[in-house]
């Protein structure tokens, strides 16, 4: 389904969530048919020396937190890569690495190349509203041999969502390597309060506006099963950060894998597990 600029402007100004959601769902189905993907992620702390036990169920091992130095970041990458085996390893937020490069007075590209040599495959996230120069930083990431797991929004900078999404479209036109965009903010900006209605609307508008990024993603661990299920009906096609825990202490139906599959099916879609490289895992 192709939506014209005039139609986008009308939809963005509308409070008719049903019409907006239907248009976004049509756009998602044109790209992904009936499939919705999800990835099970093991988070490990950025501090070197911490335990890393990567279960076979994890499709991605993600290093989270702010490294204290380039040396500490590289040391942690080597530890995690060794423990992860063949499981893809991502790590860090690109804005934190910008600041680290500045504090150590080295080029960002040099820092990223060090991480790549240590074994890192992907930078875990790049918050478009936090980076000092999103295009330059992502270009440096690409030149360093790394990929980007997802473009994110840290805290909505304003209520002008279409303007933000047009910025994302322009960024992808410049860099061309963004595989997934997670439009819902990681933290709440007190100046831009959010509701469930707003979140659903933002997901739908993201799918309609950001036509040059394949995947619109929702963080399962951050936003929960209910919003994730609704988001899948209005344009989202991927669920990030599902727990790799296979235990069923509260019963099989409450186990993370069964719960995410059930929610995807409830959205009338086909659950498909992927890994951190977006390769489909054996079902």
Model-derived regions: residue spans:
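Short linear capping/connector segments at secondary-structure termini
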Residues: 41, 153-154, 183-187
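Auxiliary Fe-S-binding modules of radical SAM enzymes
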Residues: 1-31, 55-57, 70, 83-87, ...
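N-terminal capping/lid subdomain adjacent to the active-site entrance of alpha/beta enzymes
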Residues: 26, 33-53
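Conserved Radical SAM active-site core
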Residues: 45-159
């Amino acid at each position: 389904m192709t939506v014209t600029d005039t139609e986008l402007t009308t939809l963005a100004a509308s409070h008719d969530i049903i019409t907006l959601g239907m248009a976004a769902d049509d756009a998602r189905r044109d790209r992904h048919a009936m499939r919705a993907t999800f990835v099970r992620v093991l988070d490990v702390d950025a501090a070197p020396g911490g335990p890393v036990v990567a279960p076979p169920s994890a499709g991605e091992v993600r290093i989270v937190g702010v490294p204290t130095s380039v040396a500490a970041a590289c040391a942690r990458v080597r530890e995690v890569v060794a423990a992860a085996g063949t499981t893809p390893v991502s790590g860090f937020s690109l804005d934190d690495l910008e600041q680290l490069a500045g504090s150590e007075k080295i080029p960002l590209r040099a820092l990223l190349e060090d991480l790549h040599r240590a074994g890192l495959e992907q930078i875990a996230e790049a918050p478009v509203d936090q980076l000092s120069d999103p295009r330059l930083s992502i270009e440096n990431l690409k030149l360093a041999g790394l990929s980007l797991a997802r473009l994110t929004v840290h805290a909505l900078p304003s209520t002008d969502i279409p303007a933000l999404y047009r910025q994302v479209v322009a960024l992808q036109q410049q860099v061309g390597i963004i595989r997934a965009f997670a439009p819902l903010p990681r933290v709440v900006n007190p100046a831009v309060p959010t509701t469930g209605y707003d979140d659903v609307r933002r997901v739908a508008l993201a799918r309609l506006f950001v036509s040059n990024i394949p995947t619109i993603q929702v963080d399962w661990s951050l936003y929960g099963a209910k919003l994730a299920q609704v988001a899948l009906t209005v344009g989202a096609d991927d669920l990030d950060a599902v727990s790799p825990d296979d235990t069923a202490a509260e019963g099989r139906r409450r186990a993370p894998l069964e719960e995410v599959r059930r929610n995807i099916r409830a959205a009338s879609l086909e659950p498909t597990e992927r890994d951190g490289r977006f390769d489909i895992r054996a079902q």
